[in-house]
Amino acid sequence: MHSQHRTARIALAVVLTAIPASLATAGVGYASTQASTAVKAGAGLDDPHKKEIAMELVSSAENSSLDWKAQYKYIEDIGDGRGYTGGIIGFCSGTGDMLELVQHYTDLEPGNILAKYLPALKKVNGSASHSGLGTPFTKDWATAAKDTVFQQAQNDERDRVYFDPAVSQAKADGLRALGQFAYYDAIVMHGPGNDPTSFGGIRKTAMKKARTPAQGGDETTYLNAFLDARKAAMLTEAAHDDTSRVDTEQRVFLKAGNLDLNPPLKWKTYGDPYVINS
């Protein structure tokens, strides 16, 4: 999963509130009173409310919308050399995670509409090829997106490959919700791994400049170093040369001292303004 801003999406106007019908974790509602919200003020990104915020922040950069649940059906080739990009965090046919997603979906629901594409997905893994996929695949993807089992499979793979490892590493580094989100957004775009422009390499570069809180360092100083390293990694690739998701989103929260990522949140991605009030 290495994604860029999806230019096919038309930027939405300012979203005044962001209270969806359901949260990233099913069955848990938003805090309904100031008192209950205050109790969660220092919650980690895996808190349902904070996780919903994280999903909306990523969607603002990936889809020019806070409605991340509308993205299960999304699929297109964005021309970055990674084949098709699809779903809620941009699973790619060329990087292996789309293959893993469809395999997981098939484990949950054998004989599903996408199962027949598993051989083709295995063949195109590591390339930009559409061989054996094409329009029939993209149409079937959109159909599958209506299936709650496929939606759950996307949620599962997002958490297994990206969200859970990012949050776990950030907590081990002594970072609060903003730092946990910075790690998550980085791993979504750059992928896991330890090469210089993958998440592990970006973290390693940052740790050469500043100590993590777990090492006795200052949290803000370290996060600035991490965002510097993230931006440098983005600039090595034309598909990621717009760094607004760092400059006018995460850095804005950091400069405001909002290390717990508490709403209200105001930011811009690709020049488009967004607001999460609660």
UniProtKB/Swiss-Prot annotation:
InterPro entries: Glyco_hydro_46 (IPR000400), Glyco_hydro_46_N (IPR023099), Lysozyme-like_dom_sf (IPR023346). The keyword Mitochondrion does not apply. This is Chitosanase. Changing E62 to D/Q: Drastic reduction of activity. Belongs to the glycosyl hydrolase 46 family. Its EC number is 3.2.1.132. Aids in the defense against invading fungal pathogens by degrading their cell wall chitosan. One of its GO terms (cellular component) is extracellular region. It holds the Pfam family Glyco_hydro_46. The active site is at E62, D80. It is an enzyme of class 3 (hydrolase). Keywords: Glycosidase, Hydrolase, Secreted, Signal. GO terms for biological process: carbohydrate metabolic process. Residues 1-40 form the signal peptide. GO terms for molecular function: chitosanase activity. The gene is csn. It is found in: Secreted. It catalyses: Endohydrolysis of beta-(1->4)-linkages between D-glucosamine residues in a partly acetylated chitosan.
